[in-house]
């Protein structure tokens, strides 16, 4: 048997749902989708869900992962085995851990390849900081996976599809985190997974103020702006959601223009699937040039304005 009898899908990020649903279609005979609202439910059915389970009643001060208990109960009630697919977001990984405990299931994060052999999931993902690919065969009846972006192509909606809708009511967990305040992000979020052109900056850009030079290039060519992990996590120059690498975004754009990025393996795992890589770095021995199709050795602060002016013509 090369498919599961059932697969369960949930995404806290609506833009990741089409990809997860396409993976579900390849891996199971029946697709169940947990959703947070009616609009997401309608989308899930159009993307191939046979059954939609609307999570209902969570107080505003509780976290999405507190639905884990009722989700696990629902999964167990509808089969003695199954596959759970979640995005490899922060919330997706938190939920995966909770579901794994409640279902007594093996959990595998950041899956880049998923297949089924004899009713069991075989998963491949990066190990040793991206230096190798590990393969795991999950032996537990239930398997919980978080899926790296780009693992599956996005499913296409079909408005003629039909499915059944159910409601799963909130049950307060014995131990929960209560949200006391929320703060809006300072910048607009972007869906870098879908970007055709990406300009990505590293610490070689020199300063937070110099990122404006990369932003001007983005405007000139219609690209989205990304960064390396040190820019987001160490320097705090950009948001966490924009950094590319093994522990976050895995991109496949037509063009990846790396500015002041050294090219360590942990970063390149997230960018190496790009159709074309263009690098700008003042260190001619930077590892990035081993991956780049084109490169310029020089100071990015001087090169970016000239490149922007030339491409804006």
From Swiss-Prot:
Pathway stated in the Swiss-Prot or TrEMBL entry: Amine and polyamine metabolism; carnitine metabolism
Signal peptide: none
UniProt keywords, alphabetically: Electron transport, FAD, Flavoprotein, Transport
MF (Gene Ontology): electron transfer activity; flavin adenine dinucleotide binding
Biological process annotations from GO: carnitine metabolic process; fatty acid beta-oxidation using acyl-CoA dehydrogenase
Domain of life of the source: Bacteria
HAMAP family: FixB
Subunit-structure text: Heterodimer of FixA and FixB.
Physiological role: Required for anaerobic carnitine reduction. May bring reductant to CaiA.
Name of protein: Protein FixB
Gene coding for it: fixB
């Amino acid at each position: 048997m090369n498919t599961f009898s059932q697969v369960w899908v949930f995404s806290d990020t609506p833009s990741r749902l089409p990809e997860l649903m396409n993976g579900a279609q390849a891996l199971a005979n029946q697709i169940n989708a947990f959703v947070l609202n009616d609009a997401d439910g309608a989308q899930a059915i159009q993307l191939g869900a046979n059954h939609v389970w609307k999570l209902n009643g969570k107080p505003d001060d509780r976290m999405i992962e507190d639905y884990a208990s009722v989700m696990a109960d629902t999964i167990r009630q509808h089969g003695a085995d199954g596959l759970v697919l979640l995005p490899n977001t922060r919330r997706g990984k938190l939920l995966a851990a909770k579901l794994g405990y409640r279902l007594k299931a093996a959990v595998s994060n950041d899956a880049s390849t998923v297949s089924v052999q004899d009713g069991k999931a075989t998963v491949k993902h990066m190990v040793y900081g991206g230096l190798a690919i590990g393969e795991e065969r999950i032996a537990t009846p239930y398997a919980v996976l978080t899926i790296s972006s780009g693992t599956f192509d996005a499913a296409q909606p079909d408005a003629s599809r039909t499915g059944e809708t159910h409601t799963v009511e909130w049950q307060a967990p014995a131990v929960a985190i209560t949200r006391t305040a929320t703060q809006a992000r300072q910048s607009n979020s972007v869906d870098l997974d879908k970007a055709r052109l990406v300009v990505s900056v590293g610490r070689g850009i020199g300063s937070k103020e110099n990122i404006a030079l990369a932003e001007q290039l983005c405007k000139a060519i219609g690209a989205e702006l990304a960064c390396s992990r040190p820019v987001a996590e160490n320097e705090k120059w950009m948001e966490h959601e924009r950094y590319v690498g093994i522990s976050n975004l895995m991109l496949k754009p037509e063009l990846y223009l790396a500015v002041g990025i050294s090219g360590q393996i942990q970063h390149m795992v997230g960018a190496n699937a790009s159709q074309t890589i263009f690098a700008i770095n003042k260190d001619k021995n930077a590892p990035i040039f081993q991956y780049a199709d084109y490169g310029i050795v020089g100071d990015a602060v001087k090169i970016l304005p000239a490149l922007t002016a030339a491409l804006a013509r």
